[in-house]
Design a protein with these regions (language model features):
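Active-site core of PLP-dependent enzymes with the aminotransferase class I/II
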Residues: 43-66, 74-80
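Active-site PLP attachment segment
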Residues: 86-148, 160-167
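Glycine- and other small-residue-rich loops at beta-strand/loop junctions that grip anionic moieties
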Residues: 16, 45-49, 69-71, 159-162
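PLP-dependent aminotransferase-like
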Residues: 1-42, 58, 62, 76, ...
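Fold-independent oxyanion-binding glycine-rich loops
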Residues: 18-21, 40-43, 65, 69-72, ...
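Conserved small/polar residues in nucleotide/adenosyl-binding loops
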Residues: 168-173
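A short glycine-threonine-serine/GTX helix/turn-capping micro-motif
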Residues: 149-162, 174
């Protein structure tokens, strides 16, 4: 909540909050012309709300935007959001992956199914990137465009990655973690 309500506005990013207990249609009513994505949790924190992932995915795709699902609480063992139409799934490493709040980090998993070029809302993935000699992530990387952009640009420029020592002490498999 704090990320969307307090931190992102400092960067000019607006968030529209909806009451998920009112059903999936509230998501459609909140979509504006500049909406970039829909973001839900498989199990809402702190109220344990459950959302129809498939219905929200249909709404998002109808409007040419991806559905991002925070699956931290449910874990991939219990819920696999890609099977219901999610485009990106995120997990907080602080909770179940790291164990007891000793790890500050997260995991981003991209289904590779969302067409980032179709809606015209994601020029940073479609247009030539001068810092990568004109590479277009959608054209040159294809299905892995988003997650490659996160790794190649966001991690490079913002440094949001686990330290080698912390990664080594994590009980999770280490290959491919960001």
């Amino acid at each position: 909540y704090n990320l969307f309500a307090h931190t992102l506005p400092d960067f000019g990013i607006e968030t529209t909050f909806v009451d998920p207990t009112k059903g999936s249609s509230v998501f459609e009513g909140a979509i504006r012309e500049n909406t970039q994505l829909l973001y839900i949790e498989t199990v809402g924190n702190p109220n344990a709300n459950l959302i129809d992932i498939g219905a929200v995915a249909e709404i998002a795709h109808k409007h040419g935007i991806p559905l991002v699902v925070d699956n931290t609480f449910a874990t991939p063992y219990l819920v696999r959001p890609f099977e219901f139409g999610a485009d990106i799934v995120v997990h907080s490493a602080t909770k179940f992956i790291g164990g007891h709040g000793t790890t500050l980090g997260g995991v981003i998993v991209d289904s590779g199914k969302f067409d980032w070029a179709a809606s015209g809302k994601f020029p940073w993935l479609v247009e030539a990137n001068p810092s990568y000699h004109g590479l277009s992530f959608t054209r040159d990387v294809g299905a892995a465009a988003f997650v490659t952009y996160v790794r190649a640009v966001i991690l490079r420029d913002l440094g949001a990655t686990l330290s080698p020592c912390l990664l080594y002490t994590s009980p999770s498999p280490r290959d491919g973690l960001l």
